[in-house]
From Swiss-Prot:
Gene symbol of the encoding locus: Arsg
Organism, as annotated: Mus musculus (Mouse)
Consequence of substituting residue 356 to Q: Faster electrophoretic migration typical of a size reduction probably due to glycosylation loss
Primary localization class, coarse: other
Protein name stated in the entry: Arylsulfatase G
Note accompanying the cofactor annotation: Binds 1 Ca(2+) ion per subunit.
């Protein structure tokens, strides 16, 4: 307890004037070959079709499209889960939720987070001499030792969970709409369905709450400024750096102001998409100016769009999940349909990652952990197994060999949290459970357990509308391979050193800069 208190005290000292006074940029340790800088940008609830390079109907991602033309675009890239916390945990550990313990989202009142016996990417790289920063949405625990500053990040600036998990003074756009924070103590806003509590949304700098409620309309620019300043300082330090940016975009457009010109042609979601694209462009521009030759920039998303938000949700492109939509309910976020986990993905590293290349390799967010560790010349943490693989040969254009098999866990739809209920085998996909997620029209697909799984050939049916005939030789051959692959991975997980997250809830852990005020307000109205 004494050690933890001391670290909290040191990291949480107030910032006065300039940037990163507690980040040690000095060089120490042995001399070694240059290690690449790593910038990972993770969008929130962004659809595969929200990237213009993927989907011609999208015209709002000029910076990302330019990055695609200058780097590699992955068209068969998948989130490790179909909702926030599990996907982010897998990004930072290279392990599925059944191994790392994070199978569903953490709440504002969550006591726990990503289990502390799980080793994060930042912890590995910091041991290798990297200076590390995390900017944006964390959502892997905010209380005590689960905070980013205790999970390998020298610097943290952001909201510790989703940007809709607390009230603000200008709540932006949501469906259904949510009211603003009460303007004075003693008033209640009656949050209603699908809105969070009256506690104001906090913005942290390291362990300090610096705004509560946060001003969402200026948040994207604050994230860009912090990212740019970190890259600037780290690039002159002589040390390699890791920057992980968890965007507040896309989610729902809580930060955008109403479009003034041509509103019929400029949706709120598109305005938010352009704002996100500008933020990414600023980060890439800084990399180009100060660290272009030795920096890998990897952009992707945590899961697909949130269909129940209707016009405030993103585009799945051609991955409609038609079988599910005909049954009712959503085939996007929370589900194992393609719209729930197939996400945009780009890699950029001039001189190393070939330009204007489209990769069809079957890849996953799980692969970032082992790939980055290999590029840094580090070793994987011992005494545990990993679901991701080193795909640097794919990154460098030397191979199109990705995964043969991927497993898609339930992320809040029908079935148990974290259960591997869908299996991807080459271009085939087998569903053992379907239904359970809400669509825009309010319908929820019936929970259906398929003893003989639905199997789709994605080369012929990217829309997942027509499964294979169960009596066909093709179905029987795929079924045999899928059954064996699923049995093997479940046995492998059973034999692994797995963790279990603490999902206990306690109102006393809610972030609060002013416990004497009902909403924890520290900012004047």
């Amino acid at each position: 307890m004494g050690w933890l208190f001391l670290k909290v005290l040191l990291v949480g000292m107030a910032f006065s004037g300039f940037f990163y006074p507690l980040v040690d940029f000095s060089i120490s340790g042995k001399t070694r070959a240059p290690q690449p800088n790593i910038v990972i940008i993770l969008a929130d609830d962004m659809g595969w079709g929200d990237l213009g390079a993927n989907w011609a109907e999208t015209k709002d991602t000029t910076n990302l499209d330019k990055m695609a033309s200058e780097g590699m675009r992955f068209v068969d890239f998948h989130a490790a889960a179909s909702t926030c916390s599990p996907s982010r945990a897998s990004l930072l550990t290279g392990r599925l939720g059944l191994r790392n313990g994070v199978t569903h989202n953490f709440a504002v009142t969550s006591v726990g987070g990503l289990p502390v016996n799980e080793t994060t990417l930042a912890e590995v790289l910091r041991q290798e001499g990297y200076v590390t920063a995390m900017i944006g949405k964390w959502h892997l625990g905010h209380h005590g030792s689960y905070h980013p500053n205790f999970r390998g990040f020298d610097y943290y600036f952001g909201i510790p969970y989703s940007n809709d998990m607390g009230c603000t003074d200008a709540p932006g756009y949501n469906y259904p709409p949510c009211p603003a924070c009460p303007q004075r103590d003693g008033l209640w806003r009656n949050p209603g369905r699908d809105c969070y509590t009256d506690v104001a949304l906090p913005l942290y700098e390291n362990l300090n709450i610096v705004e509560q409620p946060v001003n969402l309309s200026g948040l994207a620019q604050k994230y860009a400024e912090r990212a740019v300043e970190f890259i600037e300082q780290a690039s002159t330090s002589g040390r390699p750096f890791l920057l992980y940016v968890g965007l507040a975009h896309m989610h729902v457009p809580l930060s955008v102001t109403p479009p003034l010109a041509h509103p019929q042609r400029q949706s709120l979601y598109r305005a938010s998409l352009r704002e996100m694209d500008s933020l990414v462009g600023q980060i890439k521009d800084k990399v180009d100016h100060v660290a272009r030759e030795n920096t890998l920039l990897w952009f992707t998303g945590d899961n697909g769009p949130w269909a129940q938000k209707c016009e405030l949700a993103g585009s799945v492109g051609p991955f409609f999940g038609l079988w599910q939509t005909h049954q009712g309910g959503s085939p996007t976020k929370q589900t194992t349909w393609e719209g729930g986990h197939r996400v945009p993905a780009l890699a950029y590293w001039p001189g190393r990652v070939p330009a204007n290349v489209t990769s069809t390799a079957l890849l996953s967010l799980l692969d970032i952990f082992p790939t980055v560790i290999a590029l840094a010349g580090a070793s994987l943490p011992p005494n545990r197994k990993f679901d991701g693989r080193d795909v640097s040969e794919v990154l460098f254009g030397k191979s199109q060999m990705g995964h043969r098999v991927l497993f898609h866990p339930n992320s809040g739809a029908a079935g148990e949290y974290g259960a591997l209920q869908t299996v991807r085998l080459n271009h085939y996909k087998a569903f053992y459970i379907t239904g359970g997620a809400k669509a825009c029209d309010g319908s929820v697909g019936p929970e259906q357990h398929h003893v003989a799984p639905l199997i789709f050939n994605l080369e012929d049916a990217a829309d997942e509308g027509m499964p294979l005939q169960k009596g066909s030789p093709e179905y029987q051959e795929v079924l045999q391979q899928v059954t064996r692959a699923l049995a093997d991975v479940l046995q492998d997980i059973a034999d692994d050193n797995s963790s279990r997250a603490d999902y206990t809830q306690d109102p006393s852990v809610i972030p609060c800069c002013n416990p004497y005020q009902t909403t924890c307000r520290c900012q004047p109205v």
